[in-house]
Amino acid sequence: MKAKPMMLAAAVLTIGVAACGTPPTAQSLVSQGLKAQLAGDESTAESTYQQAIKLDPNNAVAHYNLGTVYDRQGKTSQAVTEYTATLVISPSFTDALFNLAVDTATSDPAGAQRLYLRVLALQPTFAAAWLNLGFIVRDEGKLAEARTDWAKAVALDASLASHVPTIPAPTAVTKPVTPPPTSQP
């Protein structure tokens, strides 16, 4: 008696696989996850990317996309974990470097600065990296360097101009003018 239910489950599984064709690959799951994510179905995207990672733990795109889902859900620590996994697999994945820098800028500005510099070494035209690097160096008190970084960002993408803060240019320090000595009170 106990063998029949097991055979039925095996038969249902076999029929299910045969009806669907071949089992999904990590790549096909990543594609499905992306479709769900672009449609706004983050829950489906999350579980689909997780399935892809179970099938292929070295799928950098699955880790990266899962990180973006976690970011949108406000799960920053989980996003950081996924971006870090992406970079272990693919150290030159510029979008993962950038997103990791964004997510760690508050807690580790020096580390985020290094990440932005890596992004820019790989992709010097990444305007948002120049913009964000400018904010970090500004917070270090390096206003001239921040202005230079922001100028590069805006030159690459004029739409970023609205994100650049207005910081007065340094003025020349002059000695106060004092009247010449006089004999009159």
Regions found by a protein language model. Give the residues of each.
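Terminal, low-structured helical/coil segments at or just beyond the last alpha-helical repeat
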Residues: 2, 135-185
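Canonical tetratricopeptide repeat
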Residues: 31, 65, 99, 132, ...
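Structural signature of tandem alpha-helical TPR/SEL1-like repeats
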Residues: 39-51, 72-85, 104-118, 141-152
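Structural marker of alpha-solenoid helical repeat scaffolds
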Residues: 55, 89, 122, 155-156
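Bacterial Sec signal peptide processing site at the extreme N-terminus
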Residues: 20-32
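TPR alpha-solenoid repeat register
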Residues: 62, 96, 129, 162-163
